[in-house]
Structures are given as structure tokens and as C-alpha cells.
Amino acid sequence: MDIEKIKREIEELKRQKNAIIVAHNYQIDEIQEIADFVGDSFYLSKVCAERTEDVIVFCGVHFMAESAKILSPQKKVLLPEIDAGCPLADMITEEDVDSLKEKYPDYSIVCYINSPAAVKAKSDVICTSSNAVKIVRNFPNDKIIFLPDKNLGSFVKKQVPEKDIILWEGFCITHYKIKKEDVLKAKEAHPEALLLVHPECRPEVVELADFVGSTKQIIDFATSSKAKEFIIGTEMGILYSLKKRNPDKKFYILHPGMICPNMKKNTLESVRNALLYDRYEINIEENVVEGARKALLKMLELS
């Protein structure tokens, strides 16, 4: 495989199609290197809403590409690997939301962006890991159903104790691998290092952290910190940006299993093929787009 040749082809196809490539922080290094924008879900949501290009190639997982389409329905949104899904997003359905609304009519639905478009469409507002606390705190209803991630929900609940928050039982299978024992071992091995974790981690892991935040917030914290060593409790794709921005600092992944197999499905070849063959295009029913867009725009308003 001639990597440089594929990169040149991607650049040429981008010009021809008036396209941009956006990539999540968990993507493989080669994709982050060629992307026009790299970041967390919230940052990429704003990018997709604001850019004027005709085509968005979203290097992430399915729900992220859906969100890009919802915010920019007039644009062509391509997901290089159509089977790049998210087990967490699959833990909630629109039927589940209907049941919750029937059971708790006075509660508002705050939906984590890691969810299907049809679920977003039935929610009152969307949030990301970077703004979940702010969204719940600023939302005008004190009765909240937070879905689908129970760990992020637990983190929010602790930060906003004045609100009545019901949690759904979903979780990220990658972050869920980290246990308290892993943290204690890592801290023993690297006593000078600060522990930075994602709020999708278990509550007992989050409690031991020096900083809790989204991938972008973790990168920003490590970059601005005077500390020289960090234990990182999130998917290892984040190491690319951490090391690039902080070549003089040391980073240790908290658990060797911190790899999201779905995030790693996108490759340079599949990005090239996405642009070459217009695949795989994200299409969403108009009524779903309308409801989900309203909830996503509410997020941008409240944050």
C-alpha cells in the first residue's frame, strides 16, 4: 500500500468534491493526520454546522455522521465504514423513550449524543461529554431523564445534585473495562502522574481522577498543565493529539484494552473510497431530522 499516493488522491478528491474531512480523537493516527478538523463530539458538531463545503467525510462512528447530517441536512455526509457502529448507542431505542415518557410525563429527556437519530428526535435536548453538566444545569426542568450512558449520567448527577435525575442503564463497553484496581496499580507505577479520565468511566474510577472531561478537555488540560506525566483513562486514539501537542510530556494509558474497535474501522483507503464513490452516504427520514435537529440546536443554545 502506497500511503503517500493515497493521501495525494484524498487531497485531490477533496478539491474536486468541495469536501472536508472531520475526525474524532479516537481515530487511527493516519486519519487524524489527514483530517481538516480533529476533536470531540461537541467540537465536530459545531464544525459541521458552520462549514460551507458540500461534502462532509465523517471519520468516526455512525451516530456522529448522523449528527452531522442532522445539523447540515443540505450537505452530503459520508461515513467511510458503514458498519462503524456504537454499542452504547444501540442500548436505547425510540420505543424505550416512548415508554419513559409515558411512565414519567413530568420529566424532560436529556440525551447523550452517543445515540441513534430516532432517539434524539424524541428527546428535549442533546448533550456531549464536554457540556452535559452545563446542559442539565441550564435546562428549565428540574426533573430529568438522562440517557443512554449511566456513567456520564452519574457524573452529571453528582455535579447537579439539586435536580431529580433518572438514569438509563447504558454504558460504553470500552470505558467500562477500567476498574478501581487498574487505577490503583497505575498510580502506584506512576506516582507523579495526574489521572485524567473520561466521564464514561465507572463512578469509582471518576472519583479517583485529578481531572474528568471529554477528549478535547483532556487534551487541553494536559497541554496547559505544568505536570509532566499523565495517566489517561480513555480510548488510546487520544494519544496522537496528546503527544503531538506535548512532545516533552509522558502519557500512560490506564488499561491496555482501551481500544474502540468501531472507531478503528476507518482507514485511509476507506476515506479515499468514500470520496471516490460517494459512500457511504447518510440519509435520515425528514421527520426524524426535524425533531433531532431541534434537540441539537437546543444543545448549542444552552451551551
Curated annotation (Swiss-Prot):
Its cofactor is [4Fe-4S] cluster. It is found in: Cytoplasm. InterPro entries: NadA (IPR003473), NadA_sf (IPR036094), Quinolinate_synth_type2 (IPR023066). Iminosuccinate binds at H24, S41, Y112, I113, N114, S129, H198, P199, E200, T215. It comes from the Bacteria. GO terms for biological process: 'de novo' NAD biosynthetic process from L-aspartate. Pathway: Cofactor biosynthesis; NAD(+) biosynthesis; quinolinate from iminoaspartate: step 1/1. GO terms for cellular component: cytosol. This is Quinolinate synthase. The lineage of its organism: Bacteria, Bacillati, Bacillota, Bacillota incertae sedis, Caldicellulosiruptorales. The gene is nadA.
